[in-house]
């Protein structure tokens, strides 16, 4: 039970009109620590009690009598709780030094499955910064859900089917060079893709030719299939090299093509349930009763199935294969209407588990305020960006610690961590402007800043040769250490909030606050000096390091021991 839960429990025993859950939601953290650690506003009770909030607050403060609090006082309409710093710091430090990286582990998920649809780059196109968001958000959510007791299944739903393959085949047959493609597959295929899109704007016959080649591909034409397979294989080699560098793994690479033979079954179910309507030669599902104006287009007039038909097949396959408790789609917010339709059609089909599907949208990455586009060749490629971030990190590490032994390894962890952290600290639904210099800075709210705080603590612990005792009696009651204790105590709740909101930025912002609080503590406190508090200060440093490292791990970011 954390402090807020304890206060809510105590208050619920003397307030008849509010239950513990309602009280918990009303509790606030005062801006000024002189007003206590936690405050309960009495306004909501005024109407029921028919008394002024100030009077209610005074009565509640009078009735509170718990040894967990240093004091409880009424200040105007608020009941302010001052916590017993020594007792709580002892509990928190005991918990972290005993449980170590398992501190804040929970079993909310009871080992049920969470399927995470993430990354999903398009075959034969380079892996750009645009794909990074889905990849790192999905990977972080996987760590977060595992932390609270779920098993996760990470699915890379590759864009390995569609008219763009008709475009690529036409471009390759017209202008492609087999040796050049073998040497630099993605670069060459991107050039071909950009060129045919540019030329098709002036020559509509290229579009028709591409459609024809895609029809051949759908019908199993040998040449079309061989080229498609080659484009796919070459792309996957490149993608996997990047995933290895990012330290992101997947449980399934079943992409769009995997569902080619599973869509007719979906159309049959819709037909049997009488859900398909004819509209201008096409077959659709009406979704007006769900407040969705446009019907879901299942089959075009030429018999071709659509994106939503494929996603329906994927949803049915995943439910059958994984029996998921949650199915999460980490896909850009421009797809919001599509996922509303997907859930509504599944509901119409009678599948209650459609409620377990969640679209986790995210904002765009821009460069100097401009939208990025592969088609127009205006794109930030991930591989050279990672190399540049690692190079910049190495320059700063050499300046700070020229004697460091494994500079390359540390620069790699810092450079890649910087890119991931910058993305994840941004509220998911907001976009951000790509700025490598800001990302790799050791100052400000960045990954390197948090990593450096962790490495600094490790240096302190090495100097002290500190090993925490499981039965150690550690406690502190000064203001600076109290700020850190409150944050560490809050870590389990922070993880729950991040999971409930599918929002890794909650953990990134927590990591920044904890690093800042420790740096402030370090500036004011002589941790290594001989004093009665020395062991407790070292235990606090140790606990901070444990929680910082775990917060970074939940974001998919490494924590180097030395920097």
Curated annotation (Swiss-Prot):
SUPFAM superfamilies named among the record's database cross-references: Anticodon-binding domain of a subclass of class I aminoacyl-tRNA synthetases (SSF47323), Arginyl-tRNA synthetase (ArgRS), N-terminal 'additional' domain (SSF55190), Nucleotidylyl transferase (SSF52374)
Keywords tagged on the record: Aminoacyl-tRNA synthetase, ATP-binding, Cytoplasm, Ligase, Nucleotide-binding, Protein biosynthesis
BP term (GO), one: arginyl-tRNA aminoacylation
Enzymatic class: ligase
Coiled-coil region: none
Any GO MF annotation of the entry: ATP binding
InterPro entries in the cross-refs: Arg-tRNA-ligase, Arg-tRNA-synth_N, Arg-tRNA-synth_N_sf, ArgRS_core, DALR_anticod-bd, Rossmann-like_a/b/a_fold, tRNAsynth_Ia_anticodon-bd
Record-level GO cellular component terms: cytoplasm
Main location: cytoplasm
Motif annotated as 'HIGH' region, chain positions: 121-131
Subunit structure: Monomer.
Name by which UniProt lists this protein: Arginine--tRNA ligase
Gene name for this UniProt entry: argS
């Amino acid at each position: 039970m954390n402090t807020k839960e304890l206060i809510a429990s105590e208050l619920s025993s003397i307030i008849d009109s509010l239950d513990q859950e309602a009280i918990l939601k009303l509790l606030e953290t005062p801006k000024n620590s002189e007003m206590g650690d936690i405050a309960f506003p009495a306004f909501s009770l005024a109407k029921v009690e028919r008394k002024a909030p100030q009077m209610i607050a005074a009565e509640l403060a009078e009735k509170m009598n718990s040894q967990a609090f240093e004091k409880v006082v009424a200040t105007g309409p608020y009941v302010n709780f001052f916590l017993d710093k020594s007792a709580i710091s002892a509990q928190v430090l005991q918990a972290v030094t005993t449980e170590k990286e398992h501190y804040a582990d929970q079993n909310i998920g009871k080992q049920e499955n969470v399927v995470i649809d993430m990354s999903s780059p398009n075959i034969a196109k380079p892996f750009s910064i645009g794909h990074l968001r889905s990849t790192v958000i999905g990977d972080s959510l996987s760590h977060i859900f595992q932390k609270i007791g779920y098993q996760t299944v990470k699915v890379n739903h590759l864009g390995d089917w569609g008219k763009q393959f008709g475009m690529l085949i036409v471009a390759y047959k017209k202008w492609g060079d087999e040796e050049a493609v073998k040497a630099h597959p993605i670069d060459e295929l991107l050039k071909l893709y950009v060129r045919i899109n540019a030329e098709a704007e002036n020559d509509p016959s290229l579009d028709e030719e591409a459609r024809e080649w895609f029809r051949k591909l759908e019908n199993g034409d040998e040449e079309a299939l061989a080229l498609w397979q080659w484009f796919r294989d070459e792309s996957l080699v490149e993608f996997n090299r990047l995933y290895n560098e990012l330290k992101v793994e997947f449980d399934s690479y079943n992409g769009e093509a995997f569902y080619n033979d599973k869509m007719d079954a979906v159309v049959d179910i819709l037909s049997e349930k009488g859900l398909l309507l004819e509209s201008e030669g096409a077959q659709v599902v009406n979704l007006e009763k769900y407040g969705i104006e446009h019907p879901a287009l299942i089959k075009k007039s030429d018999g071709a199935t659509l994106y939503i038909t494929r996603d329906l097949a994927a949803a049915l396959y995943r439910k059958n294969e994984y029996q998921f408790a949650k199915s999460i789609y980490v896909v850009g917010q421009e797809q919001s209407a599509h996922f509303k339709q997907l859930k509504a059609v599944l509901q119409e089909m009678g599948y209650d588990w459609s409620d377990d599907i969640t679209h986790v949208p995210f904002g765009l990455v821009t460069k100097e305020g401009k939208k990025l586009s592969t088609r127009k060749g205006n794109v930030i490629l991930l591989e050279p960006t990672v190399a540049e971030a690692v190079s910049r990190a190495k320059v700063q590490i050499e300046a700070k610690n020229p004697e460091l032994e494994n500079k390359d390894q540390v620069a790699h962890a810092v450079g890649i961590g910087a890119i991931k952290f910058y993305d994840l600290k941004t509220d998911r639904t907001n976009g951000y402007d790509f700025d490598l210099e800001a990302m790799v800075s050791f100052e400000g709210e960045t990954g390197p800043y948090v990593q450096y705080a962790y490495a600094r603590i490790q240096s302190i612990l090495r100097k002290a040769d500190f090993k925490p005792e499981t039965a150690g009696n550690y406690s502190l009651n000064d203001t600076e250490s109290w700020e850190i204790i409150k944050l560490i105590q809050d870590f389990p709740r922070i993880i729950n909030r991040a999971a409930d909101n599918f929002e890794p930025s909650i953990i990134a912002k927590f990591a920044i606050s904890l690093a800042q609080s420790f740096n402030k503590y370090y500036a004011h406190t002589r941790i290594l000096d001989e004093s009665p508090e020395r062991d407790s200060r070292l235990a606090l440093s140790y606990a901070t390091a444990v929680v910082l490292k775990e917060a970074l791990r939940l974001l998919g970011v490494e924590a180097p021991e030395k920097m």
